[in-house]
Amino acid sequence: MGMKMGGVNMLNTLMNTGYQLLLETVFYIMAIAVLAGAISGLFSEFGVISMVNKLLSPLMKPLYNLPGAAALGVITTYLSDNPAILGLAEDKNFRKYFKKFQLPALTNLGTSFGMGLIVSTFMIGLKLKGGHAGTAVLVGNFSAIIGSIISVRIMLHFTKKEYGTEEYCVQFEEHEDMDAIMNTREIRDGGIGGRAIEALLEGGKNGVDVGLAIIPGVITICTLVMMLTNGASADGTYTGAAYEEIAFLPWLGKKLEFILSPLFGFTDASGISVPITALGAAGAAIGLVPHMAEAGTVLANDVAVFTAMCMCWSGYLSTHVAMMSSLKVNKLTGKAILSHTIGGLCAGVAANWIFKLVMLFL
């Protein structure tokens, strides 16, 4: 890396990229975590989490082997970003539904739907040759669900070996009735207004703690991923500016094109750069698509795959480390990344073939 960029330029790029990530990514994630934490605190105080758990347990248990309350994490991350689920995980009224082996899988579950609304809205707005962008996005969302189930199930296979399947995250006294605890919740003293404000502030404070906890992981890991993903400046030279990198991952993708293209059905070899970029940042990945669509190298089938993989992966290499650290399960980070890599690949393959099947009837 230093030989290609020059030692001084490489160090300057490292520092500038880390600084830009702090300003543009970390504080953004912290803001999301604060808002999500505040909302989850409000939901917890007024029984929304308990209600969601009761309503969706019949669905979440067979699909994910998670309590129904986990569905609230899906909704939260779909509307915002991966770390939003951490604000929920800090709430005792949310954690009490989870056994110890289930909690680490929240990282995989939340990441599978991170930035879902943003990615979907962005892709629907594309002007594609042949149309069908809306159908492609629907297929992509459905395929992301498939990928999330695979990712979570693989992760639970590892966590069961680590924690067993009996112990709950929230410790209860021997004399306490488990059924009574699961069907009741703690509330604050005072009127509705006072309880709401207190819940919002306490939940937001949990979000600040989450935002601070993810700083080391985001800056170090995401900087490394960016160094391997992006290319040189516009004129092909290295100046030491942020995000000037050696573009190793796109180069690797082209070398593996003979394997990846049949699986994902890309219209053009350049399409592989989108899911590869999504490893580090979904926002950066979808930013590549409009130019490809204008050039005619991206069609509806590609959009289905991009939607599924950008949603399912949504920059997991840059957030998984921080999220697992925040949940205090660092030792399982490698297994979480492996599980999610497989889940994202399955989401992309599913999107390709499901879209082809759907188009037979349209």
Give residue ranges: language-model regions.
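Short helix-coil transition sites and intra-membrane helix breaks within transmembrane domains
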Residues: 28-30, 41-51, 64-67, 73-87, ...
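C-terminal transmembrane helix pair
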Residues: 84-153, 282-362
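Membrane-interface helix termini and inter-helical loops of multi-pass transporters
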Residues: 8-20, 128-129, 234-235, 359-362
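N-terminal signal-anchor module of multipass membrane proteins
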Residues: 1-46, 51
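Membrane-embedded helical hairpins/re-entrant loop segments and their flanking transmembrane helices
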Residues: 39-72, 89-100, 256-260
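Transmembrane helical segments that form the transport core of multi-pass membrane transport proteins
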Residues: 7, 36, 40-56, 189-282
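Intrinsically disordered, low-complexity non-transmembrane regions of multi-pass membrane transporters
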Residues: 158-205
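Alpha-helical membrane-inserting segments
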Residues: 39, 43, 147-155, 159, ...
